Amino acid sequence: MDLSGNEKSRPWKKANVSSSTISDIQMTNGENLESGSPTRTEVLSPRLDDGSVDSSSSLYSGSEHGNQAEIQKELSALFSNMSLPGNDRRPDEYILVRQTGQDAFTGIAKGNLDHMPTKAEFNACCRLYRDGAGNYYPPPLAFDKISVPAQLEETWGMMEAKERNKLRFQYKLDVWNHAHADMGITGTEIFYQTDKNIKLDRNYKLRPEDRYVQTERYGRREIQKRYQHELQAGSLLPDIMIKTPKNDIHFVYRFAGDNYANKQFSEFEHTVKRRYGGETEIKLKSKSGIMHDSKYLESWERGSADIRFAEFVGENRAHNRQFPTATVNMGQQPDGQGGLTRDRHVSVEFLMQSAPNSPWAQALKKGELWDRVQLLARDGNRYLSPHRLEYSDPEHFTELMNRVGLPASMGRQSHAASIKFEKFDAQAAVIVINGPELRDIHDLSPENLQNVSTKDVIVADRNENGQRTGTYTSVAEYERLQLRLPADAAGVLGEAADKYSRDFVRPEPASRPISDSRRIYESRPRSQSVNSF
């Protein structure tokens, strides 16, 4: 393969180093693709030939001939045991990924390179940089993670934003170049340029039709940015990267109906580690292009590796699949005694089917009552307002609204902030699923409450400032994420607010994929991060 367009590429990997797209982790019941043999590294001990120095030279002639042998012996011992510069660096500190065909990629870790790539070869690949937790970042994301010392930010604080951004970029670029020199990488292109032909929506995000890259055999994959150089920027990487203890690299795609359909990530992990060894690392690609280590994901959010594994093929890991996809709150009505009825969120689909000509159904079809509508997020564990879901997940919003018969215009409605928060505060703190509706927990009889589990209960969320957000989240999701319950919801449930969060230990910050090795501004030593990476 001609990497640069001008020079012919050579094999990069050492003899017998395994590197493939699918390896022998079977995703189908068909042909089993055999991987290469394990890595074998030859150790060459440099030595001087006795005849390499002219014994007749006047410098070593006569009585000094004995000294010549001693010098040769000393030099031979010195060279044989002398460490190379940078020998203490990780052999997997970077991985080079080339595309070898449609949906086919080859990855080679630094330590398994057969020769030093040229500048053009480095820049023709997707370079993946390892951080302290075992995650791998493509160039634009690694560059973005470079931190600027607080004292510099403070110095620049009074400058115009344009000048401040310029200085910040120059600092990062200096760190970037020094780090690459330390790693021995001569190709230093960042590939941060986005495709100017792709227009953004009114929220400065990709439009739904531009949020995906298409594979030939495995369907489409969602991305967050459209780069000019999609390969080098990491947008085209397969779903899963496997790195063996010998630093062999394998890539795997998931697809509908594969051998792990509706199975947990743990089953896939068990298969991989049984094949390659218990220290094998599994990286799962994010929508941004970061290859996140599965253990890192689990250290932050329990079950998140399995959720991402499922998302590759559109599988859902909702705690309760009985939640209505859209509801309308028919409560908050005058109760005849000077007060208001409690919240009663009825399934929109149920309403449209059972009472399509009712005033409520007709009003919803016109786009009215939008501030009483709640929509189930893609993950099936949260309810959001139409406006919020349209902003955060426009594709899911459009599909859901079409399915339940609600106009998309609801997503473009919003109240003034004061009215919005007033309405949020009036909402029930705890709601429970009850057939085709969600009821304020106070409406359920003691007998019914006995049959309620955490999967049936959702609570009104609050932000860091204690304000209601207008969203509802499953209590089972609070438990999975080890989040602190809102105080009012905890009180209604009769639980401690820290029931799920008290045992959560925040992982140590991982060292960044690119950092200033000169440590001019930051000399604080870092402790080991997740999994001692």
From Swiss-Prot:
Subcellular localization, as worded in the UniProt entry: Secreted; Host nucleus
For biological process, the GO terms are: DNA-mediated transformation
Q: One Gene Ontology cellular component annotation? A: host cell nucleus
What positions belong to coiled-coil segments?
none
Q: Keywords for this entry?
A: Crown gall tumor, DNA-binding, Host nucleus, Plasmid, Secreted, Virulence
As one GO molecular function, the record gives: DNA binding
Where does this protein have compositionally biased stretches of type Basic and acidic residues?
Answer: 1-10, 515-525
Sequence segments annotated as region (Disordered): 1-67, 504-533
Secreted is among the record's keywords: yes
Where are the compositionally biased (Low complexity) regions? Answer: 53-63
Induction notes from the record: Targeted to degradation by the host proteasome by VBF and Agrobacterium virF in SCF(VBF) and SCF(COI1) E3 ubiquitin ligase complexes after mediating T-DNA translocation to the nucleus.
Biased-composition ranges, Polar residues, are 16-42
Q: Which Pfam families match?
A: VirE2 (PF07229)
Subunit structure as annotated in this protein's UniProt entry: Forms heterodimers with the chaperone protein virE1 that prevent virE2 anarchic homopolymerization. Interacts with A.thaliana VIP1 that mediates its translocation to the host nucleus, and with host (e.g. A.thaliana and N.benthamiana) VIP2 that promotes T-DNA integration into the host genome. Forms a complex made of VirE2, host VIP1 and VIP2, and single-stranded DNA (ssDNA). Forms a complex made of virE2 and host (e.g. A.thaliana) proteins VIP1 and VBF.
Functional note: Involved in DNA transformation; mediates the nuclear uptake of single-stranded DNA copies of the transferred DNA (T-DNA) element. Binds single-stranded but not double-stranded DNA regardless of nucleotide sequence composition.
- The name of this protein is Single-strand DNA-binding protein
Taxonomic lineage from the root: Bacteria, Pseudomonadati, Pseudomonadota, Alphaproteobacteria, Hyphomicrobiales
